[in-house]
A protein has these predicted regions:
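Non-catalytic regulatory/interaction regions at protein termini and inter-domain linkers
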Residues: 1-25
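N-terminal membrane topogenic signal
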Residues: 23-37
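Hydrophobic transmembrane alpha-helices and their membrane-interface boundaries in multi-pass
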Residues: 38-128, 146-152
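Alpha-helical transmembrane segments and their helix-entry boundary regions
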Residues: 132, 136-142
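Generic detector of multi-pass transmembrane helix bundles and their immediately adjacent loops
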Residues: 154-159, 163, 188
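Loop-to-transmembrane alpha-helix initiation sites
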Residues: 160-172
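Juxtamembrane or sensor-core-proximal signal-transducing alpha helices
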Residues: 171-200
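Conserved HAMP-HisKA connector
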Residues: 196-225
Length: 225
């Protein structure tokens, strides 16, 4: 597989272009669901901490800020669904901002709050951030490389006994995420292309039957005459 095939998920590029608005709309709908879930979860967690006496401002305040950001992104996504002219670029912007929000939470709670421990949470974030939405491989690769650059710079700046392990685990998580995200979106485009071809075949068959049904009465009348 060459680079062109990789970036187009193995399909001809011109066949994927009509599906960009469909992809953008699906991503915005997904973002509204994620935004609702995160807004609730990021508020419930600090409340539970307060109820059980584990309130710590450095742990709870970022979650409340993230809940507000998730709510804002959800409302913005809902408004964009009603604006088809700017659907594709705004969908890319909003999904990128949501992915950045999740990554920043992973960086804060793993690298900043626990700088000398193995980055389990951040590795999980590096994996799932590529699976949140359907995007082109080039976009996913940019997201992965940006995240890895942040991790490497941080590990080089802060003394950490698990430096090499953390970098290696984040790198492996990014590779797995890229692989899974590519096949996930590849299968999605495959289903869309299959549905389009089936619809075209049914329309062609319907038009053929209509033409035959119009031709048959004239043929019979000509034979009788």
């Amino acid at each position: 597989m060459n680079f062109t095939q990789w970036k187009n998920f193995g399909y001809p590029g011109q066949e994927l272009t009509p599906f960009e608005p469909v992809l953008a709309r699906d991503n915005l709908v997904t973002l509204t669901n994620y935004g609702r879930l995160c807004s609730i979860l990021f508020v419930i967690t600090p409340v539970c901490h307060c109820l059980f006496g584990f309130f710590q401002p450095l742990s709870t305040v970022p979650l409340l800020l993230a809940a507000g950001a998730a709510f804002f992104l959800r409302r913005a996504a809902q408004r964009c669904l009603n604006d088809p002219d700017q659907l594709v670029p705004r969908a890319r912007l909003l999904t990128s901002l949501f992915t950045l929000l999740i990554f920043l939470l992973g960086v804060y709670y793993d690298l900043i709050r626990h700088p000398t421990e193995i980055n389990v949470l951040l590795c999980l974030v590096m994996l799932i951030q590529l699976l949140l939405f359907d995007a082109r491989p080039g976009h996913n690769l940019t997201v992965s490389l940006s995240g890895l650059a942040v991790v490497v710079l941080w590990e080089c700046y802060v003394p950490d006994p698990h430096r090499l392990i953390n970098i290696m685990y984040c790198f492996l998580a990014s590779l797995i995420g890229l692989y899974l995200a590519w096949h996930k979106t590849h299968n999605m485009f495959g289903m869309l292309l299959y549905a389009q071809r089936e619809k075209a075949a049914m329309e062609k068959e319907t038009s053929t039957q209509a033409a035959v049904s119009q031709f048959q009465p004239h043929f019979i009348s000509n034979m009788l005459s």
